[in-house]
Regions:
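Transmembrane-helix motifs of polytopic, lipid-linked glycan transferases
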Residues: 184-188
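Extended, low-polarity transmembrane helix blocks
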Residues: 1-181, 191-276
Length: 276
């Protein structure tokens, strides 16, 4: 990895963020909507702040590299010694497992995280949602089967599940679970805290909304979140995961908080970062 390549990665990341904001959201660049006190997460100032963070992260990474660059060679030892093991392409291993390519995950994190935070903020501020009235209305419309028409819900078992939740008034408390769940997923992705887990619960909500017949932005967020889940080891490196993952570890690699050790200087989960 060289400084020039890092500059290219930074440009690609910034461009991808702009494309996502342009293609899958409306009005995120409007200068007359820079700040909304009643919808803070939707304020367009965050578009420019997040874009600036991507650029700053890229420039910082480039300046930290030696002028000669760093040789990156993903290991393929497992495929060579394990019978039946199929090795992944080098570019895929680098993208999902090398922190020097984590810049490319910033636009996905920022876009998906902001969408979740904005959706959650709207629900938290809505008194009708807080009482469960809005959710009850949504479920009622979803389970309805119009005469001669196509029901919103394709699968009968899911319609029965929502009907059960309606009959037992789950909406009185489940509305808060959804609202604050969206807020937490959004914050987790934006600050890079347990990105894989946050993205996973985001896909659970996307999947549930789609099963209930609501398309909206759910297919887009679901697809982008799947990639964040796959890249969980490095997607949050420019964020709190840089420190959280080595501390907490995984079921197959104990974190330093449980071993009483000192985190490595530039850590990744599952082992130390090789810089040569």
């Amino acid at each position: 990895m060289t400084r020039q390549k890092t500059y290219i990665l930074t440009a690609i990341s910034a461009g991808l963020f702009l494309v996502l904001c342009w293609a899958f959201a409306d009005g995120l660049f409007a200068l007359d909507s820079l700040w909304h006190s009643d919808a803070i997460a939707e304020s367009t100032i965050w578009t420019y702040v997040l874009l600036a963070l991507i650029v700053v992260a890229g420039l910082y990474q480039a300046r930290r590299l030696p002028e000669s660059g760093i040789a990156i060679h993903p290991s393929n030892e497992a495929a060579m010694v394990t019978p039946g093991q199929v090795d992944d392409p080098v570019w895929w291993k680098l993208l999902l497992g090398n922190v020097y390519f984590s810049l490319l995950w910033l636009p996905l994190r920022f876009f998906v995280g902001r969408e979740w935070l904005a959706a959650g903020e709207h629900k938290v501020r809505d008194s009708a949602w807080g009482t469960g009235e809005s959710l009850a209305g949504y479920w009622t419309g979803a389970v309805a089967v119009p005469e001669g028409g196509r029901p919103a819900i394709t699968y009968g078992w899911y319609r029965d599940l929502l009907q059960y939740m309606l009959d037992h008034k789950w909406y009185t408390w489940f509305a808060d679970v959804i609202a604050w769940g969206e807020v937490l997923v959004g914050i987790g992705l934006l600050v890079g805290a347990l990105v894989g887990i946050a993205a996973f619960f985001g896909t659970v909500m996307n999947f549930s909304f789609q099963l209930a017949g609501s398309a909206s932005s759910n297919p887009v967020l679901f697809g982008l979140s799947v990639f964040l889940i796959l890249a969980w080891k490095v997607a949050g490196f420019w964020g709190l995961d840089r420190y959280l993952l080595p501390l907490l570890g995984t079921p197959w690699h104990r974190g330093t908080i449980f071993e009483g050790g000192t985190p490595p200087t530039t850590p990744v989960v599952g082992g130390n970062l090789r810089t040569n």
